[in-house]
Amino acid sequence: MLDEKMHKAISIIQFKLEGQLIEKHPEFHMEDRRLLHQMDLEKGTVVIEGVTYPLKDKCFPTIDPKNPYQLTAEENDVVERLKTAFVNCERLQKHVRFLLTKGSLYKVYNGNLLYHGCVPLNEDGTFTEVDIYGEKYSGKELYDVLEHYVRKGYYSLDKEEKKKGLDICLLYT
C-alpha cells in the first residue's frame, strides 16, 4: 500500500513538471500530454480529446485545481533533494559519462540500424518533421540534433544551452 502511495505521489510530481515544460515549449506540440488541467476533481472525471472519463482514484490532495501544474512546497523539496542526490552520486555520474562517451541515440551495426526510442513517422511511413527550438528536423538529422542537445544538457557550461539540453532530455525520454 505504501509503495502505491509513493508511486502515485512521484507520478503527480512528474506530470506537473512535464506539464510545465510542455507549456514552456509549445513548439514541441505535446499539449495533448497535459491532462491535470482537464481533471474535474469534484466530479472525479478527466476530459481526453473531448471525451469525459471517470477517474479510478479521486484523491489528489496536492493538485490545486486553479493551478494544477504548480508543485507544492513539499513536492518542490522532494524534487530538490532528488536532484541533489543525482548530481552528487559519483557512481551515477560515472555511468552517465560512460554512456555519453561510448553511447549514442543510434548506431549502424552489421548493416542494421539500432536506435533508442521511437522514430516519428507520418501516416505514409515518411519521417515526420519535428520542431526543435525553431528549426525542423527529421530522420537521422533529428536524432543527431537530439543527441547534440543531450550532450549540451550534461556538459555545457553555458546556463541557457544547458537548460535547453536538459529540457530536451526530459521531454524526449
Report the location of each language-model feature.
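Feature recognizes metal-dependent phosphohydrolase scaffolds
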Residues: M1-L171
